[in-house]
Amino acid sequence: MPIKIDKKLPAVDILSSENIFVMDDDRADHQDIRPLNILVLNLMPQKMVTETQILRHLANTPLQLTIDFLYMSSHQSKTTRAEHMETFYKTFDEVKNRYFDGLIITGAPVEHLPFEAVDYWEEFQRVIEWSKTHVFSTLHICWGAQAGLYARYGVDKHQMTRKLSGVYSQLADSSNLLFRGFDDEFYAPHSRHTEVLKEDIVNLTNLEILSYGEDMGLSVLASRDLREVYSFGHMEYDRDTLSKEYFRDLKAGKNPHIPENYFKNDDVHTTPALCWSSAAALFFSNWVNYAVYQETPFDWESPENDVSFFAYL
């Protein structure tokens, strides 16, 4: 089913070339259904790349979605044109009086900093607090997951001895709706310098560990009501994203190790196999369907007609 986005967004041409169904406002407004409203807080430096990655998976869901992009006004992007941000993104002040069915918070390359040292940390905390009463389910990704846990529960991240980079096998709790239809094991890319330890969250009875791997530790956590989902990997990554990160770091003189389980025979000149796309599509689809669509109020403007939402607050 289609996603409803601005037809001028650069991702539209890419998605259309992949036979992914996108529609503009005029066509969507003539359909007599309520689309789900999804807000994406894009903290990644390459905004347009991340937009396409996220939208590609959201478009695989069987529901019509209206997507808005959010940026932190307390931070100035150095890698994306101001014109793009002004055209396609909203500030928190512009959305804070609205309700959203879902919120996606991406990763960010700020792991080396304490959370409080991130220049948009105070604004990020306001978004998290606002989401408790204005968003039905929030999907946190990588640093977004670590930051969400810290903002909500005070759980800190830990520095790893070396960067975790590669495609890793992890176990899935297929009894949970987020992993319905999954095999016992699935693969996903991970790319991070820090981690959240299992022992730091086992006493948080509101959270469940849904996916774990021997080589990369925690992969996915969620609250029991699925209003909070924390994914420490990057299921949204393209085939070549880890490759681009590797060569970027190599050029910068960081002496990176070759991403694990990625290049055939660790030959960096080969094309990496794409072995996580179907699992990623199913994960995003399950989140939209089971965590958002099946539970969110139909009429946000008249919440008294649907008290199920407020039972969670």
Curated annotation (Swiss-Prot):
Pathway(s) where this gene product acts: Amino-acid biosynthesis; L-methionine biosynthesis via de novo pathway; O-acetyl-L-homoserine from L-homoserine: step 1/1
Keywords: Acyltransferase, Amino-acid biosynthesis, Cytoplasm, Methionine biosynthesis, Transferase
Site positions per UniProt: Important for substrate specificity: S191
Binding-site positions, substrate: K163, S191, R248
One GO cellular component term: cytoplasm
Gene3D superfamilies assigned: 3.40.50.880
Function: Transfers an acetyl group from acetyl-CoA to L-homoserine, forming acetyl-L-homoserine.
Name used for this protein in its record: Homoserine O-acetyltransferase
The organism of origin for this protein: Streptococcus sanguinis (strain SK36)
